[in-house]
Swiss-Prot record:
The protein's name in its UniProt record: Probable chemoreceptor glutamine deamidase CheD
Name of the gene this protein is made from: cheD
Domain of life: Bacteria
E.C. no: 3.5.1.44
InterPro entries linked to this entry: CheD-like_sf, Chemorcpt_Glu_NH3ase_CheD, Cytotoxic_necrot_fac-like_cat
Enzyme class: hydrolase
Catalytic activity annotation: L-glutaminyl-[protein] + H2O = L-glutamyl-[protein] + NH4(+)
Source organism (scientific name): Solibacter usitatus (strain Ellin6076)
GO biological process terms held by the UniProt record: chemotaxis
Function: Probably deamidates glutamine residues to glutamate on methyl-accepting chemotaxis receptors (MCPs), playing an important role in chemotaxis.
Record's keyword terms, sorted: Chemotaxis, Hydrolase
Family: Belongs to the CheD family.
Length: 169
């Protein structure tokens, strides 16, 4: 397996069966994975903040830092590799309250709400999520099978089982 690390404020696309996309230490950030099971193409975004209007220059410099600029770029890149927008299935993890126990800023919740709004407007189904709470999470997406793994509190679980192989209905 070829592991491709998705860093903070980063986005990667996988198109080969042996590739695994992984992002680590999702606290208040959100890790969004999207996958087309028929084309066996997927992508992952690790964004930090909900809205680029707080710093438009930084949003232009690195659109993956923000939900409103990063999510459309992720969809564009995955579809550019051959995925069909109508078949995209999305999963999200993160959005925790890590350093803000009184939820004064509640960046995690704001990140999650931005995600829901953007995906709804784009017509993309959010099929699953592991958001909120106070735990850091790690996510891995196996491109060949579509399996999605979540690690939280030292325990790993499969969020999405294997999809039928490429070329099916």
């Amino acid at each position: 397996m070829e592991q491709i690390i998705v860093g903070v404020a980063d986005c990667r696309v996988g198109h080969a069966p042996e590739q695994v996309l992984a992002t680590y230490a999702l606290g208040s950030c959100i890790g969004l994975s999207i996958y087309d099971p028929k084309a066996a193409i997927g992508g992952m975004l690790h964004y930090m903040l909900p809205d680029s209007t707080i710093d438009p220059a930084r949003g232009r410099e690195n659109p993956y830092m923000f939900a409103d600029t990063g999510i459309p770029k992720l969809v564009e890149q995955v579809c550019g590799r051959g995925a069909n927008r109508r078949r995209l299935i999305a999963h999200a993890a993160g959005g925790a309250s890590m350093m803000d126990p009184q939820a004064v800023f509640d960046i995690g919740k704001r990140n999650y709400l931005a995600l829901r709004k953007i995906l709804w407007k784009a017509g993309i189904l959010l099929a699953g999520e592991a958001v909120g709470g106070t735990n850091s999470r790690t996510v891995r997406l196996e491109i060949g099978s579509g399996r999605l793994w979540l690690q939280e509190n030292g325990k790993q679980k499969e969020l999405v089982p294997s999809f039928p192989q490429k070329g099916g209905n």
